[in-house]
Amino acid sequence: MPLDVQGFDDLMTDISGMADRLDVNGAGAGVARQILEDAARPIHQQMRSNASQDPRRRSGDLYNALKIGPVKRSQRCGKHITIGVHRKDWSHEDYYPAYVEYGHGGPAPAPAHPYIRPAYDTRADESYEIIREGLRDAINPHN
């Protein structure tokens, strides 16, 4: 029994057109970068809110170190963005943000005071919606 497939050329044309709309004038990287940066903002805001509400906050160094990193590209993950304290941007001798987030069991154990994971859990749906809308607008700007 032969199988007749129709519309495959139209599908390929549509997919190619979507890719072209994401890469307007070779600026597709800028479109993806902007979408990721927009999606990172709600989580970053919540993270800063969580860090500022910690009753043990002393210097404000952790709060001030929370940043949205640059959009990077990797073969395995595609484009990605990081939000948090980036070790290379930490200006103090002692790097302690991870110990605040996870706690530690050293000679004087300290409990965890998470600020990163709760921010993601609280605002992830909002960020995913920003990504969906951004891609939808980039692919089909007439809707």
What are these regions (language model features)?
Residues 1-82, 88, 97-143:
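Short, Lys/Arg-rich flexible segments
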